[in-house]
């Protein structure tokens, strides 16, 4: 797909739109399911943004709350171990 941008032709990024995994499965993000929550964490343990996860805004907010609860209950780490090992 090409389109004009200030007189220049730009090639857009093709691809399929991501579908919200939680809406597709009909479930809600739950802090008691750390394996499912880990898929939404980056390699350093940070929560991935919506544009990477493909979640709706509502589900992204619920996911964030579920991840934070799981971290406080020690079901998920705040920081991945590989990051802390590099500093030593």
Swiss-Prot record:
SUPFAM superfamilies: Ribosomal protein S18. GO terms for molecular function: small ribosomal subunit rRNA binding; structural constituent of ribosome. PROSITE patterns: RIBOSOMAL_S18. Gene3D superfamilies: Ribosomal protein S18 (4.10.640.10). GO terms for biological process: translation. Disulfide bonds: none annotated. It holds the Pfam family Ribosomal_S18. It comes from the Bacteria. One of its GO terms (cellular component) is cytosolic small ribosomal subunit. The keyword ATP-binding does not apply. Keywords: Ribonucleoprotein, Ribosomal protein, RNA-binding, rRNA-binding. NCBIfam families: S18. Belongs to the bacterial ribosomal protein bS18 family. Part of the 30S ribosomal subunit. Forms a tight heterodimer with protein bS6. Binds as a heterodimer with protein bS6 to the central domain of the 16S rRNA, where it helps stabilize the platform of the 30S subunit. This is Small ribosomal subunit protein bS18B. It comes from Roseiflexus castenholzii (strain DSM 13941 / HLO8). The gene is rpsR2.
């Amino acid at each position: 797909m090409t389109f004009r941008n200030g007189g220049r032709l730009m090639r857009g990024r093709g691809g399929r739109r991501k579908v919200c995994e939680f809406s597709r499965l009909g479930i809600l993000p739950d802090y008691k399911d750390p394996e499912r929550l880990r898929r939404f964490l980056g390699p350093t343990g940070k929560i991935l943004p919506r544009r990477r996860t493909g979640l709706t805004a509502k589900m992204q907010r619920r996911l964030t709350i579920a991840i934070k609860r799981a971290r406080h209950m020690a079901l998920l780490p705040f920081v991945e171990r590989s990051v802390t090992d590099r500093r030593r």
